[in-house]
Amino acid sequence: MKNRFKNALLSIIMLSFLFPSTSVVNAQGEDFVIDTNTEVTYSTGDDFATVTTEYIRNVENSEYYFPATGEKIFHIPDITDNSQEEIQVERKYKLESLTVKDFTGNDIDYSIEENEAGEGIYVTVPNYKTTTSNSAYHIVLEYKTHDYILKIGDFVNIIGPSLPEETIFEKTDEESGTLTIFNYNFTVVVDEDIPTLAKAYPKYTKMEENGRQYFEFNQTDRIGNSPSLEFGTSVLYRFNLEYTTPQTDNFIPEKYSSLFNALSTNVYEISLPREFAETNQRVYIESISPTPKDIYRDEEGNILALFELPANKDDKIEITGYISVEQDSIEEQSKTFDMSLEDYFGEIKNSDYIGRYLSGTEYWEINDEYIKQEADTLIKDQGTLLDVIEANYKYVNDKLEYDQNKATSENTRIGAKEALLGGPSVCMEYADVMISLLRAQGIPSRAALGYANLREIAPDNQVRHQWVQIWVPDYGWLSVDPTFESANIKIGQMVDRILWEVFNDDSLSNIKIYSANDIVDLTTEGFVVNVFGVTDEVDLETLKTYSDYTASGEVRDSQEPNISSFVGTALKTTTLGKAVLVTLPIFLVLVTLIAIISFVSILIKRQKRKKKEKSQIKR
């Protein structure tokens, strides 16, 4: 997944003509000032915002005027990674609310040109009046859109348009020598009921007036950077997991296994959503079917569960529950994860724990000469850990191009080296490259997988997202998402996502099957997860946790063996185990019969002996 707002640029094009009112005289200072003032106004609880763009053309030099000819063209952007259908639906919503007025509130004629999906809409407004030093020219364009709002429960992320890199703020006409100043003011307006501010980018100034909060962003800071405000410090998600387990046994009929299910049983091991300290992620279970035979925590902290299901028919594992995540308010946040490189390497050098997060793999080619060279260049002359992370982040964004076609088709992993050489890349390659660079620099890191860019409605075919985690002493695992192509780097607490599992190697899945049947290839086909934000109140105290499904009342670590679970799995999912299960009852019956016969034989012998003894006494 990439930054869906990266290309949301409000381009401004002016087509008009300039005429001198008398003889041309070189002006002192600016001759013309053109202001483009954009406000994105959001009301708490809505899932849309109102965008108001006020275009003002002022003639400061009375020697000149603009005639009532030419036109002004506004650009209303699309979100480029939306589907064509989504773009068309959103365009209809925008156009139905579109108004174009003059300064007095009167409607102005305009025309619409819809471009191909992803290229936006052009609104052309003919110049309706002459512009002089005594009479400025105003256009007020307004429309509603969902594009700038990401709402999940009480969490709201408002993202505004950036300015193109080629934006100019002043221009001198070569023929007339006149100077034009261009101002691009941008403000986000929210009401007093908005949740607590958690994050903001870039720098802003804030004003409060009449129950509203105004966040203003400097125009130079907006070049290539989308302003972003995150309101809300907690989010609750609901998740549904459904895994259709395939039939693998075509030999034993159901009528026999229904009497003795161990005759045809597969044991599935799957990962469940985990807990995570950085965002205080907690998991609450509403239902699990069937009840897991065992739940444990692996060395990375992932939660794994064992389920027994019939092997001779299709069946299902179904789990529903909730996941809560939290982040600090903007006042409470601090970059406690940052430290000098000297201190950082000094603290981790004697740790045995981080060794497995520094080695190379098939897809993290840290010993490749090209990757080593790039990693060395990026870390050279850097002073702090954050400096290195930011350098790596920018490098990955500059080198890789997100491939939307790969994201929506079969996703073949290519590894860091091939991605750097121009191979098709999605979030997996962005993470692989950054992990390779970090490990080559001696910075322990691992892959994180979960679900990101979440909404209140789960999309069809929801796919997993991959990002990076970096080990930092006294902080723990620090999350970084290099797929988010922006100078506003995704780092630290992120509540627009949930973490499912992590890996210190090339693995991307914890799904395993233990079976006595020959299974050539186990795929994730039939494994479906939906995660979406919750707006209703949920009493989490009435729900269960993983420990409620264990015999001991605690989730054990993988280093603590569960002998009964191991023996049960071995007996039910191996040929030898099944042989034991089938022959053991027969063996026990035979042993029992032999014991009974032996016991009866002994009794008969004793009875005969007693009779013989009595007969001898009578004599």
Where on the chain are the PLM-derived regions?
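Bacterial N-terminal signal peptides that target proteins for export
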Residues: 1-9
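Bacterial N-terminal signal peptides
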Residues: 11-20
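Lumenal/extracellular ectodomains and adaptor appendage modules
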Residues: 26-349
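Acidic low-complexity segments
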Residues: 296-421
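Active-site neighborhood of thiol-dependent amide/isopeptide-bond enzymes
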Residues: 380-467, 471-473, 488-499, 503-506, ...
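Active-site rim recognition segments
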Residues: 453-579
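Alpha-helical transmembrane segments
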Residues: 590-606
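Cytoplasmic C-terminal tails of single-pass
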Residues: 606-619
